[in-house]
Amino acid sequence: MKWQGRAILLPGIPLWLIMLGSIVFITAFLMFIIVGTYSRRVNVSGEVTTWPRAVNIYSGVQGFVVRQFVHEGQLIKKGDPVYLIDISKSTRNGIVTDNHRRDIENQLVRVDNIISRLEESKKITLDTLEKQRLQYTDAFRRSSDIIQRAEEGIKIMKNNMENYRYYQSKGLINKDQLTNQVALYYQQQNNLLSLSGQNEQNALQITTLESQIQTQAADFDNRIYQMELQRLELQKELVNTDVEGEIIIRALSDGKVDSLSVTVGQMVNTGDSLLQVIPENIENYYLILWVPNDAVPYISAGDKVNIRYEAFPSEKFGQFSATVKTISRTPASTQEMLTYKGAPQNTPGASVPWYKVIATPEKQIIRYDEKYLPLENGMKAESTLFLEKRRIYQWMLSPFYDMKHSATGPIND
């Protein structure tokens, strides 16, 4: 087949122009990779929270809610009752805790009666012994006075007896008169001995009564103390009975009731959520970020991070700025991470240490369409962290560094 057209040959591009373009391109490329920099970045998950955090109150027992003391939106103080939960058990004879409580209350009444009777008996016994002691003390005082006067009389009679002997020696009286006087003196001496013996008996009886008063008082006090100990044990048992019957769930912090999870008549199990309490006055919201161990060394307080909220899509609201406030230097425990809904979950066989980073969003309230949309507890967010900054050529050569490390032998420090 013959060629029917005319071929037109265009003039070629000059060599110098090709060389110039190549030099310009290569120079620009080299300047770009040598002067230009790039920051390695990583995306991490997190959630919005406050300080103090919202409090979740869980049930520690299994039972039925029989009373509700608060309502949603109500301000409460630490220690205020929230729910009354009935955990009692019933048998054919009635409610076990009620029967047990009645038995203990009856025992307490009997113990109180015994203590009252013991105190009354103590008072009567000690009063009786005290009266006897006073009587013997009075008798001892009177007998002591009588003995004193009798001793004075004995001295007088002894002088008279000596005078009679003198008179008899002079012949003024006969021997019978002297004998009568001597007999009278010794008779009075015997009477004095009897009075002295009675006086000593009174003194001994006083000592005995004083000892009995102390002994009886100590004995009654000991018996009363034993009964009081028994009453204390019964009161403790009564408290334990109350614990086995009804449990009052109380608020653990000041705040406002945000939501109630159960209602009156509903059954709850151990670990069930009962209510949530949020702080009354929220000044600032914070962002809890979970950073892997290969990124946390490159983060420091004051760094800027980009935030994208799940509730405010970045396609419509864009990204938001936040500042790193604190960085934990120890991995977060599994128990701590379980308290955050947005925390990453470690899969079996691939446990990764996560570090908690707290950032402060610059915008606490987002304005959109003439409305102000506040941040809320638990909002999920994703953050971009900017890590190490290198020249572009260093990033391009990083695979060769890996080859170098793999080919390097043992290192001798």
From Swiss-Prot:
InterPro entries cross-referenced by the UniProt entry: CusB-like_dom_1 (IPR043602), MFP (IPR050739), Secretion_HlyD_CS (IPR006144)
Main location: membrane
PROSITE patterns registered for this protein in UniProt: HLYD_FAMILY (PS00543)
Similarity comment: Belongs to the membrane fusion protein (MFP) (TC 8.A.1) family.
Source organism (scientific name): Escherichia coli
One GO cellular component term noted in the UniProt record for this chain: plasma membrane
Pfam family, one: HlyD_3
BP terms from Gene Ontology: bacteriocin transport; protein secretion; transmembrane transport
Signal peptide feature range: none
Record topology, Cytoplasmic segments: 1-20
Keyword Membrane: yes
Entry protein name: Colicin V secretion protein CvaA
